């Protein structure tokens, strides 16, 4: 790790500390993720190293680039391109003010492009949330930590014992489904889309059952009619309260009808009926010309404050 000089600690991710660091030779700024794993004495599993090495091949403008993997003794460092802010911090730094709809549209389109690319390479994220969506002053948004779940699993708690958020977790996972599909990421994107519009988390649950019930209260309790096979999922209970669905107009009143339609398709209960990232990119919501220079200008102003 002598190549890198740590500049400052910038956060604590799911798997370990993240540092802003500088390449001593080139001066390039990088994000250095130190992976802390509760491992047996042998150190880092070779399967994890294999999985992670594959991620270096994921090259896309909306994916945070994994530049290098440095593995010594029982430590694993992942070297990523550096971006100065995540979407959560960005939204928290502009409380009360709404994000312009053109910026939301631009961010959503870019997120779907990144997710579509990863899904086409058979990589599922499984833990998308505003904290791992990184933005820069040029109006770009990039997905971080893609593929780490497959290498390391998604723990219930971070290495500092914080609970890993459930707010963006798909209902099939909450109901105990053992089979993950790319649809779990689409659900998360739906939650993030709504949060960008309303500036409030859509389903801020504090336990798995609270998380499920918040979803049911808003979208109605699922049944075999709305989600064939739901009653067979391991954690489904016939005794769940029966809530009826609310209209999306109540939830995202200031979103245009095409946006509401797309949100509805992102938040489909049945994973097999949930829209894919690729199909979502062709949705009429995106057909109006994208004023990205305006989006860029807006972000730039915010970065200067």
From Swiss-Prot:
Tissue: Expressed in cancer cell lines and glioblastoma tissue.
Occurrences of domain Protein kinase (ranges): 4-286
Alphabetical keyword list: ATP-binding, Cell cycle, Cell division, Kinase, Mitosis, Nucleotide-binding, Serine/threonine-protein kinase, Transferase
Active site: 127
Record's catalysed reaction(s): L-seryl-[protein] + ATP = O-phospho-L-seryl-[protein] + ADP + H(+); L-threonyl-[protein] + ATP = O-phospho-L-threonyl-[protein] + ADP + H(+)
EC top class, as a word: transferase
Source species, domain of life: Eukaryota
One of the record's GO cellular component terms: cytoplasm
Residues that hold ATP according to the record: 10-18, 33
Record Pfam families: Pkinase
Swiss-Prot/TrEMBL GO biological process terms: cell division; cell population proliferation; DNA damage response; G0 to G1 transition; G1/S transition of mitotic cell cycle; negative regulation of Notch signaling pathway; regulation of G2/M transition of mitotic cell cycle; regulation of gene expression
One term of GO molecular function: ATP binding
The EC number(s) this enzyme carries: 2.7.11.22
Effect of residue 106 to N: In a glioblastoma multiforme sample; somatic mutation
Subunit structure of this chain's protein: Interacts with CABLES1 and CABLES2. Interacts with ATF1. Binding to CCNC/cyclin-C promotes RB1 phosphorylation.
Family as reported in the entry's similarity comment: Belongs to the protein kinase superfamily. CMGC Ser/Thr protein kinase family. CDC2/CDKX subfamily.
Function: Serine/threonine-protein kinase that plays a critical role in the control of the eukaryotic cell cycle; involved in G0-G1 and G1-S cell cycle transitions. Interacts with CCNC/cyclin-C during interphase. Phosphorylates histone H1, ATF1, RB1 and CABLES1. ATF1 phosphorylation triggers ATF1 transactivation and transcriptional activities, and promotes cell proliferation and transformation. CDK3/cyclin-C mediated RB1 phosphorylation is required for G0-G1 transition. Promotes G1-S transition probably by contributing to the activation of E2F1, E2F2 and E2F3 in a RB1-independent manner.
Name of the protein in its database record: Cyclin-dependent kinase 3
Species the sequence originates in: Homo sapiens (Human)
Taxon lineage: Eukaryota, Metazoa, Chordata, Craniata, Vertebrata
């Amino acid at each position: 790790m002598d190549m890198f000089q740590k500049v400052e600690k910038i956060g604590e991710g799911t798997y370990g500390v993240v540092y802003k660091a500088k390449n001593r030779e080139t001066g390039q700024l990088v994000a250095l993720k130190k992976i802390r794993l509760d491992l047996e004495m042998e150190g880092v599993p070779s399967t994890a190293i294999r999985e992670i090495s594959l991620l270096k091949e994921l090259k896309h403008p909306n994916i945070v680039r994994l530049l290098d993997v440095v593995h010594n003794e029982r430590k694993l460092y992942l070297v990523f391109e550096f971006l100065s802010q995540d979407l959560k911090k960005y939204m928290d730094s502009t409380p009360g003010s709404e994000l312009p709809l053109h910026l939301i549209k631009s961010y959503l389109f870019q997120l779907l492009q990144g997710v579509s690319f990863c899904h086409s390479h058979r990589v599922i994220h499984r833990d998308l949330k505003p904290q791992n969506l990184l933005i820069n002053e040029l109006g770009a948004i990039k997905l971080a930590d893609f593929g780490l779940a497959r290498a390391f699993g998604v723990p219930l708690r971070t290495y500092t014992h914080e609970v890993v958020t459930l707010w963006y977790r798909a209902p099939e996972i909450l109901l105990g489904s053992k089979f993950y599909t790319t649809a779990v990421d689409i659900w998360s994107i739906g939650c993030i889309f709504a949060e960008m519009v309303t500036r409030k988390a859509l389903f801020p649950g504090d336990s798995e059952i609270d998380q499920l019930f918040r979803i049911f209260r808003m979208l109605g309790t699922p049944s075999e009619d709305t989600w064939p096979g739901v009653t067979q999922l391991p954690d489904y209970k016939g005794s769940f309260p029966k809530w009826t669905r609310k209209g999306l107009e109540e939830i995202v009143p200031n979103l245009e009808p095409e946006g509401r339609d797309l949100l509805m398709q992102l938040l489909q209960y049945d994973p097999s009926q949930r829209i894919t990232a690729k199909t979502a990119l062709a949705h009429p919501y995106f057909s109006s010309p994208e004023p990205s220079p305006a989006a860029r200008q807006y972000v730039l102003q915010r970065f200067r404050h």
